[in-house]
Amino acid sequence: FSGAVAEEDFDPVQLMHDVNGTYTELFTTLCKPEYDSVWVEKSAAVVGEENAEMVAEILKSVCTGTIFGEEAVKAYAEAPEEAVFDCYFQGGVSKFVFNDGNVKGLDTDGNVVFDHNYTYVETLPDTIACYLYKTDDADAGDFTYVALAPDTPATTYHIEFRYGGNYEDMGKLYEGEYAYWMGAGILEDADAEMIDNVIALFAE
């Protein structure tokens, strides 16, 4: 992933404030045809023009998988060279709204899927390098936990996170209920500069 690395002196409570905003799926945005030339340009700066288009497609493909969890574990065990991450939103959520510890999920029609307040619980293992938050709402179900990577719009131009109701699997990247899944979001009002910057980040 492109993101920042969790650090010992990082403030996970502040992180929940630093990600304030409304987010749509990062790769649904970045994979729009109008940004193809930006991907090629940023890739060319790293690998040269000859291989830029191929590399750009590879970079997009590793984050646009369509399976996760046990289905992905089984599929990639049989064909490890095909392993990619699903970085889309799950659970019927189209947009996420972060607001000082409150997280709200909206569907494609703008209806509220969930709306809970979260508090910091712990730092997850280095393999996932995320901070775990939990709501005390008894009916939260698959939205009981939110795990945030230390990415913010101000630092890496996007956010990376996952959510679920299975505490044991929240910190596992390659096994369990959330294997090969890490949602990625970008501010819904991201301007051309932010999109340019985040594509450059993934191309590095």
What are these regions (language model features)?
Residues 5, 31, 76-204:
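Calycin-type beta-barrel ligand-binding domains and close structural analogs
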Residues 19-20, 27-34, 59-66:
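Sec/Tat-exported extracytoplasmic proteins
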Residues 47-86:
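Low-complexity, serine/threonine/proline-enriched polar segments
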Residues 35-44:
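Short Gly/aromatic-enriched secondary-structure transition segments
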